[in-house]
Amino acid sequence: SGVIRAESNSFEIELTQLLSLGERRFYANIHSMNHPGGELRGQFVPAEASAVFRANLSGNHAVPVSVSEATGTAMAEIYGDTLMIVSGTFGDLDSPVETIGNRPGLFAGLAGESGGFVFPINTTLGEGGLEGEIEASNNVFLLNEGQRMELYRRGLYINLATADQTNGALRGQLAPESQIFMHGFMSGTLAVPASSSKGYGNILAELNENKLTISGSYQDIDGSPGGARLHMGYAGSTGEQLFVVTTVGELIEAEENAFDLSEDQLTALMGRQIYFNLPSSAQSAGEVRAQLLPEATAYFVSTLSGASQTEVVNTDAYGQAILEYTNGVTTVTGSFSGLDSDFNLNAAGGAHLYDAYAGSSGEIVQRLNVVLGEGSQSGIFAAEDNNFNMEDADVTSLFDRGQYIS
């Protein structure tokens, strides 16, 4: 910890730097031994702002989801009840930003919803239209009362469509500044047992100290929805109920869903061990499910079964793993259970990430570390044990669906 004292931090700045400061291009960065690139960062905005909202721009938030290495961040400053100024950057898009038809804009809708157009977002694009800036001076808006209420309920989002992703390649939900943002994508694939539901949805989770606030929505559930809950458990397993989630129709409102976490629950959340589950009349155990995960560039899910082996294995064993990818770094979490014999640690460690398409066998990319359960026929992939760097060729293969876990 430390303090930044005024007498030790007084600087003269040039006119160009002053202009950059006014455009919100100045930020403070705190470096640490574990995070040499920076562990804490803060963008400078005028002190008169009554509130600051942030949107992490990602294809994960788009509806439907867009899988790419594109990223971005936007901020919205609020002055009084009506004035909003938006700024930020984005990059690494696969195709140019749409600037005429589906131009960048601010839309109304909770996470997981597609909503109506509110304001155009003016961008200054780089070469090829694959990156750009959202300049503060070009994005000043006056909110009416309804728009202001939407903002504070997490009901406004930024959407950037591209030539190849006309519905949206990058999307970010505006939410109040928080210590940590997390994301959950709802799918029947993540349910235990897996569901063939066409339902989908998204959850935005904000963590401040021990207060967890969630918001979002779900769509196209096959049955009549039952009681939504937050549970304890890794991907691929089920666990105890923690909190009742209040829903209004298909919406999850932030003001109705703020929870105080115990120290154990906080540790579990950071370890990817808390999930949202929505049972229905069609799937009483859960029609769609979402694991709460730290913000990442992309997420990949691997459902583990004997049927997926190149030579099918008839087994009741089941499991699931989720891989988070950001800037060449991956984290794998999940679980498996029901093996019909003991886990074979002597098989070069027993669990690995391989490089090959479905139906074929490939080379080992990375050993996965397993914490075995009682009896050695079940186990978990803990986040702290399965964090590793990826070579560029392996990243390309991953995004091409060319990797599997065995």
List each language-model region with its residue ranges.
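Metal-centered catalytic cores of metalloenzymes
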Residues: 1-228, 232-351, 355-406
